[in-house]
A protein has these predicted regions:
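Peripheral interaction segments used for macromolecular assembly
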Residues: 1-77
Length: 77
């Protein structure tokens, strides 16, 4: 998978809850390994937050990015 295909992918936590979408990828320029991914969390139609995840917290990358941990996101009512 190329980075441009990775950006915009839906991210799920280990309980299959939608966490957000991949917004950016930071990688080590010497090794080429991904270090962190930045997620955009959409609370509602007008509010967005960002979250940074370590690459070690990713279980699977495919149709979805699945994390190996639970992420709690606050929702506004």
């Amino acid at each position: 998978m190329q980075i441009k295909e990775f950006i915009g992918s839906t991210v799920l936590d280990k309980n299959a809850n939608v966490v957000g979408k991949v917004d950016n990828v930071d990688f080590d320029t010497e090794t080429g390994k991904i270090e962190t991914i930045a997620l955009t969390l959409q609370k509602n139609i007008f509010t967005r937050d960002e979250l940074e995840i370590n690459f070690d917290d990713i279980q699977t990358i495919g149709a979805y990015v699945i994390l190996n941990k639970e992420i709690e996101t606050e929702t506004e009512e």
